[in-house]
Amino acid sequence: MEKKKGARGNIILECTGCVRNSHNRVSKGVSRYITQKNRHNTPNRLELKKFCPHCYKHIIHGEIKK
């Protein structure tokens, strides 16, 4: 039997600090995390505070489109 695709889907969280300060940073790259969320309970964009190895601090990571 095939399993139904539920409301839970994979999302990508991207560092908002790396995207904004891309022109004057020491390290190249953007921090991204992959996680899951329930689209029925959280229909709007998800934002979590995670550690960014490029900014060297905890900063808000926002959901991006695939």
UniProtKB/Swiss-Prot annotation:
Cysteines engaged in disulfide bonds, as pairs: none
Entry keyword annotation includes Ribosomal protein: yes
Record carries keyword Ribonucleoprotein: yes
One term of GO molecular function: structural constituent of ribosome
Superkingdom of origin organism: Eukaryota
Family to which this protein belongs: Belongs to the bacterial ribosomal protein bL33 family.
NCBIfam families: PRK00504.1, PRK00595.1, rpmG_bact
Protein name per Swiss-Prot or TrEMBL: Large ribosomal subunit protein bL33c
